Amino acid sequence: MADGKGDAAAVAGAGAEAPAVAGAGDGVETESMVRGHRPVSPAPGASGLRPCLWQLETELREQEVSEVSSLNYCRSFCQTLLQYASNKNASEHIVYLLEVYRLAIQSFASARPYLTTECEDVLLVLGRLVLSCFELLLSVSESELPCEVWLPFLQSLQESHDALLEFGNNNLQILVHVTKEGVWKNPVLLKILSQQPVETEEVNKLIAQEGPSFLQMRIKHLLKSNCIPQATALSKLCAESKEISNVSSFQQAYITCLCSMLPNEDAIKEIAKVDCKEVLDIICNLESEGQDNTAFVLCTTYLTQQLQTASVYCSWELTLFWSKLQRRIDPSLDTFLERCRQFGVIAKTQQHLFCLIRVIQTEAQDAGLGVSILLCVRALQLRSSEDEEMKASVCKTIACLLPEDLEVRRACQLTEFLIEPSLDGFNMLEELYLQPDQKFDEENAPVPNSLRCELLLALKAHWPFDPEFWDWKTLKRHCHQLLGQEASDSDDDLSGYEMSINDTDVLESFLSDYDEGKEDKQYRRRDLTDQHKEKRDKKPIGSSERYQRWLQYKFFCLLCKRECIEARILHHSKMHMEDGIYTCPVCIKKFKRKEMFVPHVMEHVKMPPSRRDRSKKKLLLKGSQKGICPKSPSAIPEQNHSLNDQAKGESHEYVTFSKLEDCHLQDRDLYPCPGTDCSRVFKQFKYLSVHLKAEHQNNDENAKHYLDMKNRREKCTYCRRHFMSAFHLREHEQVHCGPQPYMCVSIDCYARFGSVNELLNHKQKHDDLRYKCELNGCNIVFSDLGQLYHHEAQHFRDASYTCNFLGCKKFYYSKIEYQNHLSMHNVENSNGDIKKSVKLEESATGEKQDCINQPHLLNQTDKSHLPEDLFCAESANSQIDTETAENLKENSDSNSSDQLSHSSSASMNEELIDTLDHSETMQDVLLSNEKVFGPSSLKEKCSSMAVCFDGTKFTCGFDGCGSTYKNARGMQKHLRKVHPYHFKPKKIKTKDLFPSLGNEHNQTTEKLDAEPKPCSDTNSDSPDEGLDHNIHIKCKREHQGYSSESSICASKRPCTEDTMLELLLRLKHLSLKNSITHGSFSGSLQGYPSSGAKSLQSVSSISDLNFQNQDENMPSQYLAQLAAKPFFCELQGCKYEFVTREALLMHYLKKHNYSKEKVLQLTMFQHRYSPFQCHICQRSFTRKTHLRIHYKNKHQIGSDRATHKLLDNEKCDHEGPCSVDRLKGDCSAELGGDPSSNSEKPHCHPKKDECSSETDLESSCEETESKTSDISSPIGSHREEQEGREGRGSRRTVAKGNLCYILNKYHKPFHCIHKTCNSSFTNLKGLIRHYRTVHQYNKEQLCLEKDKARTKRELVKCKKIFACKYKECNKRFLCSKALAKHCSDSHNLDHIEEPKVLSEAGSAARFSCNQPQCPAVFYTFNKLKHHLMEQHNIEGEIHSDYEIHCDLNGCGQIFTHRSNYSQHVYYRHKDYYDDLFRSQKVANERLLRSEKVCQTADTQGHEHQTTRRSFNAKSKKCGLIKEKKAPISFKTRAEALHMCVEHSEHTQYPCMVQGCLSVVKLESSIVRHYKRTHQMSSAYLEQQMENLVVCVKYGTKIKEEPPSEADPCIKKEENRSCESERTEHSHSPGDSSAPIQNTDCCHSSERDGGQKGCIESSSVFDADTLLYRGTLKCNHSSKTTSLEQCNIVQPPPPCKIENSIPNPNGTESGTYFTSFQLPLPRIKESETRQHSSGQENTVKNPTHVPKENFRKHSQPRSFDLKTYKPMGFESSFLKFIQESEEKEDDFDDWEPSEHLTLSNSSQSSNDLTGNVVANNMVNDSEPEVDIPHSSSDSTIHENLTAIPPLIVAETTTVPSLENLRVVLDKALTDCGELALKQLHYLRPVVVLERSKFSTPILDLFPTKKTDELCVGSS
């Protein structure tokens, strides 16, 4: 209570503490009072305490309750208690002290009503009283105290506690609890003290119960009792507890315990974990408590750990504490020094050594000099990563310790100088060396000689040389070499350095200008000599930068074995010159002439030449500046005149701010993306940077160029402003001339300063820094200089010299660079005069204001907005000769029929520019009548139609349409809306079209009609490939009367490099046919660069066209195509061309020495390139051979027919112009992919014998032999052709960036197939989204709808159309299957009429098995061949002229190779690919099946063979996979089980093949084992899965299986499998009104009414076997027929067998029920019938059903319980219940021999969810596998056989469910409600097992009065 109030508080505090000190202090704290050693004897005087306390209480009662009275009472109470408790005999009488505390507590409790808590001493006295009593109890054992003492104490304590509780004081609660339980008898406490593991919750509960104070008492008591381990355990738990807020006391107790345990490695590690500051606090506390020894042990231990771990945290404080404690405990100085030496040995840092030296000097002074020197030596020897400053401090320390030893001081100073060379250090070293030497006095030396020698050796270890025998001059020279980095040689120093200034000047002059010529050497020498003479007098010592640079480069002379600096190599070589012969000191070559020797020596020099003053020299000597500007601003004025002249000569070559003023770029702050095909515009530069990094990383040449130009920017060293080029920087640096070059560029503040620091200080004083753009008129202001520089850079970017070639967006600020770039595109005219555009600057300047008067237009274009040549008529990027223009004008007046206008030809100046991105009209920016303005950033490609522009308005040039619009945007909307057939922008990335430059001549041309020709297609069957095709435009001129208007032909642009390459190659083979004036290429396109601007070559080729008359006929271009060499070398100057890519690859490798990796990165090798194109079906091939084979096989083109076609076509060349109708027909035929390309005709194809297009002529002269191949199905062959052309025009999609489109239905080719829904979409994604959102389709059903949509789009292109014959239905289909499905879905056509519908198409190819009694029929020969090899063992050579027909989803394509078929299935029918060609993961995807017991040929009769044959014939219908021909013998199940380990902890899968002993853990592993080891195919594994995969689970007991009893079971199971063979039932017309879901069920054809009912579960079909069978219709009529039946020797009782229902995604019904978790899709009633009956009608033969029937299923519909008709297992179950009521005694007829063995399925338990599971009963005498009762339900279910439900068939007769409900209600008392829910949600789970309870089974079934029972009554 030292913190109490006033004197009274102090007295009370003393008194409160006194009981603990007096009673427990004299007694408890002594070790003699430890429990068991304290005598128990009564002590006199305790009786006098009661009256004293009563008197105090009486006095208190007489007074009013106040703070003063309470304070007085507490003071008197403490004094009285101290008087009695401090009796000198009290410590020997525990009973006496216990009585004292009892009375004191009782008295205080009775006085509590008269005390107030406003007095702080009240609670304080009570708390101290409780603690003192508890401390006494810790030392007393209950057994030591007599009952007459202990019991009254407990009773009094409880009464006092109750009294205090009335006033809210529960201080006695802990004491009462402890005394009742026993002070040391708490079970948790006992566990802790016995060091047993304790739960954290229990520890926290104990801590919360007793509190920190009581626990501290316990720990102190344990320490006093020397119970160190117990105290350690308790204190550690308290220190780590989160229940105690302040754990410092417990931490200290824990550390104290650890110190008591030393030496102990674990204790040392625990101490080392504590933070150093906490350790220091604990040391201080221990010292204050008088525990110096513990504090010293702790300090020594922690300091040792710090020294060993090199930790310097609080190292000085720790070392100081240690020294004080060491000296206090052991005053001996020698011991202290020895300990310091020991610490120095283990120290690893110099900081620790310094701390030790300091405490030694403090404690020992001169006596510790030797140890201090020893520690210094140790510090010098440490090779740590500490800085050199610390070692210099060590040297200074040594010099201070030994001030009289001159040699040591010299060594220390030299070491310090060598570590940190400085002029001051050199001066001090010089002073020491100038002092006279001293002789070492060994006798009077302060340190031993050995230690001194060790010190000198440690110092010399830091020297790069050994100056022991050097004089001061030599050492001084070496020191000067080191000082050369920061100091120069003075005049005095140079005298000893043998270096003349003339030699160095000659050397520097030579190093600077040797490579540029020697004509100015004399001038350079004189100039530099003068400069150095002027500066030499002013130089202080160590101020030359030249010498510092020289010292960095040295060479080793082989002649004199010395090292010299390279700057003196010539001077050094003179030493070795003899008889006029020069010897190279580096390579010892000899030269007779100096002119040859000097250049040779310079080759060895690595030092860079000094070019400090080159710019001044060159200006004076050469008159031109090519170097950098002088660094000093003062050197600039004298060059201003030359710079100005220079700038005048260069200014016209660069874009400058003065030229930007005329471009109307003011107040524009937009950043368009420079990337190819990207028209994004950003309002901030940072977003452009992010966009470039994300979208145009490494594959965009234009983006790379932009970044390169950005990196070329220069920065001013004075104002940090950025400039576009070095020219702009030089032009700007004139601003910084003068003595104050640093300038503040903020608005209205142009203060100048002489240093950058002054400028920075000035900027800090600015309130608001605002920077304005330098462009006059631009008022945009920035607060950040970086943003300003980006803004100004964009101004230059907008007005730069920009290349306008297609695909090239490169820009330049210099016209020379721009012209050099254009030369890369080979666009120079024949005379090479590319500077015509420069000459036309003046004329173009006059048009600038008219051309560009809206700055926002520049927002969308980065193109040629150069002021000088903005719109030049003969620009370098689109040049046409005058002769060409005149020819075009003449042709417009003539009657020529066709004029070829290429997409990249010279007609680029006639383009119609598409929609602008902004809303400004074109009338403000239109040029004169002779020019067309073309903004370059377009969202859409130009359309291919004729549009006339007369300078003021746009006029539509189509027949009968003369609409006029003011701007291009309105014209484009008109074209999209009114002429959608011709305006067909492809879905390609938005790409900037470059503006065409205007033509000088006023041309009047005819209307151009564009006919796009598809360039390329791919051979891939992927529907996603080939969507984006590049259109080759052929503009055919017609004489239409629009000659007075200038025509503008806009052509579509390709968007990818590979298709552009194809387009360029096509240009080589084009000819200008059907015209009087023909054009031919004067040159060939050979040397194309590989950059992104490949179109530029085509432009240059077209621009060089020379039109001349050609009277002779052109040769066949098809033959020219076949003779072409499309793969050409991309290097400039190399004209090699090759037919194949491989040949080009070898050319690069051998001719140009490219690596293969580098070649594969070239453009030609990056893309799929198919240059050889079929002119009929537009398919492309990579080889000419493939194209010839295609012509021969697909189009039956031979040499005779080709010759005939050529003759006819040549006649057409001279017949004159084609008719307009014919031209339109050709155009629509070329478009070909759009269903609405000709609205009057359903389909339009060019006739092969007519000259429909120029491409027909190309292939008309093929000279290959004719071999007509047998195409069995015209539909199939045409379908393959359609697949090849998929996407050229049929899938029109819209680019993302377009504005609103006004499109009608004809331009939305993706239509919804629902009858009442007229929605149509522009792309497939929109249609799919429509199906899923509007019609609630799920993902699995979209496959069929997608095919329907494609079928509808391909309707126009089909050769043979199947039209629906119903009235008011004009739908047409590609194949008979689609028609049959439509009739069944839409017109309720019964499936009986299906053969009539299917007969229209004729069977493509039906292959019947030729073996007797085998009804199998196949569609493909491979299936028949497979069937013959597997079923009939016919392995002879089977010849085939047949092909593989794809019958999935109604597809009729034919393939001759299996690889092509597999690729087709992967792309077109991907859902079936896994089932047809890839092994499934059986463990995750197959249902639980019943076990097919091993096949034994002897026990199986003819019936089993028939069953196996029928199974095989159906399981391999769609397989097309060959299996192993050799028969494989399998083990029996018993043999397989004996291979397994009986007590294995995991599942086991033994190999069932005879002779193989493999046992694996996973099902996938055994499947892989069969495939790899036994070469089994996937189809065979699927068939034999249950025989081959046997799962032995954990805990399975392996027992003997009696073979004699297993055989009947095998036989019966096989018989039941045979009986469950699939049958197809006829559906009566009367049932057609009710939708029927696809089910696969079988019923016995005959029912014996007298036969006794028996419930019997049998084997369920293999899920994959069912998967290949087709959908079946369930009907309970008597007309049931079976195509294949098995003869059963012993007919078993009637049994209902169920087959699994394939769910909509093709898997088994295990996942079928899982799909119910999704929302049930809504579907119309007609569509429900459509789905259900469509699969019925597609079944042509029961033995061959296309795979599609298992994928496309009807929608899961809501289930009406009234219409529920149980069948299969449910039916038999109900029937069994009903019969059991009538014939209860029939159960006696059950025979155990007919019970099948328990199925051991290998499926995982995950597939069990939602399945009907039937578990066959196990015979007692024939158990195969015993299931432990402890196994979980999932483990039991894994061994059960799955029987999927069949509950959706709807008929009129509905049996009652009451019996079933009653049975469930009575038998399943605990789960009846759950069972009803399962039935309600169509997910019943019924498990039949052997009864495990004693209740007779008859008692479970209802009585006759079932109506009286209610569901759920139990």
UniProtKB/Swiss-Prot annotation:
GO CC annotation: nucleus
Biological process according to GO: negative regulation of heterochromatin formation; positive regulation of DNA-templated transcription; positive regulation of transcription by RNA polymerase II; regulation of transcription by RNA polymerase II
Biased composition (Polar residues): 1629-1642, 1731-1741, 1796-1807
Self-association and partners: Interacts with RIT1 and RIT2.
Keywords, comma-separated and alphabetical: DNA-binding, Isopeptide bond, Metal-binding, Nucleus, Phosphoprotein, Repeat, Transcription, Transcription regulation, Ubl conjugation, Zinc, Zinc-finger
Name of the protein described by the UniProt record: Zinc finger protein Rlf
Domain of life where this protein originates: Eukaryota
Zinc finger (C2H2-type): 582-604, 671-696, 714-736, 742-766, 771-795, 801-825, 954-979, 1127-1152, 1172-1195, 1310-1335, 1362-1387, 1407-1432, 1444-1469, 1549-1574
Family annotation (PANTHER family): ZINC FINGER PROTEIN RLF
Note: In some small cell lung carcinoma (SCLC) cell lines, there is an intrachromosomal rearrangements at 1p32 fusing the first exon of the RLF gene with L-myc.
Subcellular location: Nucleus
Basic and acidic residues bias (residue ranges): 521-540, 1003-1014, 1240-1251, 1277-1289
Chain residue ranges for the region called Disordered: 521-541, 882-907, 993-1028, 1231-1290, 1620-1654, 1725-1757, 1783-1807
Expression tissues: Widely expressed in fetal and adult tissues.
